[in-house]
Amino acid sequence: MAALSLYFLVFSGPSPRLHIVPYTKGGNTVKQGSAKDTKNNQHDEKPLSSTRPEDVALKPDPGHHHEEPTGTRAGWEIDIDDLTYWSDPDDPETNDDVLPGYETDGTPREAGDVARLQHEKDLRKMWRYAYKTTAKLANSNLVYGNTLNQLIQKDNRTEEQSKCLREDPNVKFKFNDDQPVRFNPYPDYNGDEWKKNGHGPYVPCKGPTGEFVEDLLVFRGRPARWPQTKFGGYDLFGIDPNLCWERDSRLGQYGLQEMKKKVGGSYKPIDWDNVNWGELQKHCLKQNAARFDMTMSKKNPYLNNYTENHQKATRSEYIKTEAPKIKGRSIGAKQGQITKESRTALLLRSYTGMKYTDNDRQVIRALVSELSLKTGGQYEVFLLVHSKNQSLPIFDDDELYQTVLKDNVPAEFHGMTVLWSDHQVWDVYPALTDEYARAVHSAQWLSVQKFSQDHPQFDHIWNWEMDFRYTGHHYDLLEKLSAFAKKQPRKYLWERNERYYIPEYHGDYDTSFREDVAKKRGNKTVWGPPDLPFVKPVGPKPPVASHEEDNYEWGVGEEADFISVGPIFDPVDSQWIISNHVWGYSDENHKSTDLPRRTTIVTQSRISKRLLDIMHVENLRGQHVASEMTAQTVALLHGLKTVFAPHPVFMDRDWKGGFLNNWFNPGPDGESGGRGSPFGWGRERRFQGTTWYYRAEPPNRLYNNWMGWVDTNIGGIDWEKKHGRPCLPSVMLHPIKNTQPTKPGHKSEFELAIG
């Protein structure tokens, strides 16, 4: 089978000689060399190719793809004709339901119909083949089973990263010979640099033990078998890749281990139900009030952006408008003058009826401690809880509000919880009349917008999903993401945002990747907002008329209005299932579906008050797009800065960079959106083996094992006695479901409606 070996050569390292086990439709094994040919019934097996991996990964498409015209496909490295007699016994899809034609033949089709085209079915089969037949390779599944016993590169870090670590002779763990060190990623509060920059005095805050919050513990080194990143990288953010986090040292002080508090003359175990995290945060902020602008005006500066004349504003009128000044952003300060620091709210998105596991509670405690208490109030953590029962008038009855709160939120978090309901936000946005448009699935930002209008003291808000876990330090992560976004130039930024950054394929982020994007996009770039008669942009004016006059300078040092942790792609023609969910944004010359828009899968993101303010105004007008598109699209329309921060993403297969680029950035200019997008209906199985997506297998498996729970024959007490205590580098994991001890034989599964 000619191409059966070709795709294997997309793996890193030496070309493997493989024992390939194809399957027939009945699930029976076909011996190698006996696959049948349609003309001769059988043919001799062709020899493995001697082509180098790097050549194959980058070579043009060698395959045939059933009616898809030349020039509209990426190179897939697998020839579908060679898979005629291979089938996956776990694949319920048949060839009975096939529509004629191809995606680019001009026939209007819904996403579900595109998925029924033969070309799409072929792609799904090719990916299943690639993923299935590599499961047992020596360089597959290296993300699993890593422990403290395997650590290497323990002292390999920059001088700046070394400053964050300190020995603690009082710490002893019996499960490992090496002992962890303290990790402190915070500024040198009240030091010379702190004072030089004009900051107010920092006051340390106490936690639930009655003592100052202690720095986290972490082990130096990384597991020897742990793979390299496939998307993104640590070096982009300055995050230390050679640290390994173990569960007891990471979550012990948040309740995974018994914590004690001094009561009278003795220490007693903490009763977490008697802790009030809301009060702890408020008291901490009060102690540090001099550092922050506590009296920010509640006025939204854009409420009068659209008068009858403004709606007819031309682009020339727009570019004369200055962006509103944001207080407290000066780098230094005059002697005796305090530079006010910005504040960020973190909203944990929850709902009534959610059952909080012990792990959920430990992670929430970690967020409050690391982001709010340790920073003296720079961050504040809230539970934003959707009261789903629309018949309960909780805002008309204080007693009912408290009842709903007590019945649905652990006592320790009552003081940091904000309830909201559908009717509450619908009353704010009466122009949104379509029932589907204003439902929480399509309009999850409405509650965040209302929160921002009610709490204007926050310059930024993190929209935080409850099924997200970060094994590393939360403050280290958020500050590094923010700093990365701030230094990004606007030139070709939207175009960099719309693709996965694959280090092995793209090279250095700030040089070769940037140059590659510029070469592929040329003049097809976003430079300021689109010219639309029904949108009056509020963002800053480009400093020069054309991107060609800018040397990657505009935007450097500018805070991002939106930070995503996934590509910000163009959903048009992507076959993403809700790409056309647009309401309003039209006139007699523009259909709603003609609106330029962008989206990101998974809404974990940071958003500025400026962007939330104009989103609020657009929704007041009845202009709306689906949740995953909302912030990105409004930012595009208003000329605001958005950044995709390519955090490290790992995979359970050692795919070559060129292979990954073909499957995950298949657009004509190397983007992840548009035709062939991996986010399209029926294509998302490609994410099965990644550590970050809205459906993926490794996140739950890794987290279960890390917590000491059995999953897919790894983890648990007996396994750890033999192999050691699991540890993980700093890695973002999503989705994480059902964070509680598993039963023997448990296996996390990956399910899709199609694919």
Roles of regions detected by a PLM:
Residues M1-T38, H43-V56, P60-P69, I78-D81, ...:
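N-terminal signal-anchor transmembrane helix specifying type II single-pass membrane topology
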Residues S5, N146-T147, L151-L346, S350, ...:
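Long, contiguous juxta-domain segments that are non-catalytic but functionally important
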Residues F8, I20-Y23, H473, E479-A485, ...:
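Catalytic core and acceptor-binding pocket of nucleotide-sugar-dependent glycosyltransferases
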Residues Y356-E370, D398-Q402, S442-L446, L477-L478, ...:
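Well-ordered, non-membrane alpha-helical segments in soluble/globular domains
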Residues E380-K388:
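Short internal beta-strands
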Residues Q390-Q457, Y475, S482-Y505:
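Active-site-proximal specificity loops/subdomain of glycosyltransferases
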Residues Q457-D467:
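Short beta-strand-to-loop acidic/aromatic patch adjacent to the donor-nucleotide binding site
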Residues R675-G755:
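Terminal low-complexity segments of carbohydrate-biosynthetic enzymes
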